[in-house]
C-alpha cells in the first residue's frame, strides 16, 4: 500500500469491506443520538437531488426520525426533504422518485435561480466577471443558504451527503454542499453506499445513475468521473486499500492534496497542513 494511501484511509475511516445492514443501523443510531443529545433540535433537513448520495442520506434521516417519534412519542420530530432546482431540472423525476422512496415527512421546494442570478449580477455590476464554474459554486452555496434557512425555521439540523469517495477528491463546493451539521455517510465509499441502498430496496435507477454535480451551464450534467479524470471504481479500490495503477493513484492523491483546505475549518495561524 502506498504511504499516502494508508494515511488517507485512516483519516477518512474507510473499511475494506462493510456489512451493509450494520452500517445502516450505525448511521441511523448516529442521527438519533445526535438529536437526543440536542433536545432543542426537532428536524433533519436535506437537499434532494435524485442521486445516490442524497437518496441514501435522506432514507437514513427519515428512518432515524420515524424511530425517534415512535420511541419518544414526540410528534414534533420531522424530516424535511428540500428540492432546490435552478430553474427547471432535467432529472426532476429522479428527485421525486427519491423522495417517494424515503417517504419524507415534508417536502419543501425552493427555486434558487432568482437568488443565484441576482448574486452574479450584483458582483458583475462592480466590473468583475463571474465564470460559469464560479457561478456553479454560487448555486451550490445558495442551496445551502436555503437549507439553513429552513432548518432555522423548524429547529433543525442540516444533513450533509459527504462520503469518503467525495472527501478524498474534494469534489464539492466549499461552504456549499460541503457545509452541513451532520454527515451520516462519512466513512463510506461509493460502492458501499450503493450496497446500503440495494439492501434498503431503493429504486435501481437512483443508485445506478451517472453521478454529476450538474452545476455548470456550459457543460450541463457533466459526469463526476469526467470532471475528475478518474472513476469511482478506482477511487473505491484505492480507499479500500487495493492496488490501483500508479497513474490513477497519483491523480487521486493529487486531488486529495490540492483540496486539503476543504477538509479543514478556516485556516488559522496554528495550522500547518498547508505549509
Curated annotation (Swiss-Prot):
It is an enzyme of class 6 (ligase). The keyword Membrane does not apply. One of its GO terms (cellular component) is cytoplasm. The keyword Chloroplast does not apply. One of its GO terms (biological process) is NAD biosynthetic process. It catalyses: deamido-NAD(+) + NH4(+) + ATP = AMP + diphosphate + NAD(+) + H(+). GO terms for molecular function: ATP binding; glutaminase activity; metal ion binding; NAD+ synthase (glutamine-hydrolyzing) activity; NAD+ synthase activity. Pathway: Cofactor biosynthesis; NAD(+) biosynthesis; NAD(+) from deamido-NAD(+) (ammonia route): step 1/1. Its EC number is 6.3.1.5. Keywords: ATP-binding, Ligase, Magnesium, Metal-binding, NAD, Nucleotide-binding. InterPro entries: NAD/GMP_synthase (IPR022310), NAD_synthase (IPR003694), NH(3)-dep_NAD(+)_synth (IPR022926), Rossmann-like_a/b/a_fold (IPR014729). Catalyzes the ATP-dependent amidation of deamido-NAD to form NAD. Uses ammonia as a nitrogen source. Belongs to the NAD synthetase family. NCBIfam families: nadE, PRK00768.1. Homodimer. This is NH(3)-dependent NAD(+) synthetase. It comes from Ligilactobacillus salivarius (strain UCC118). The gene is nadE.
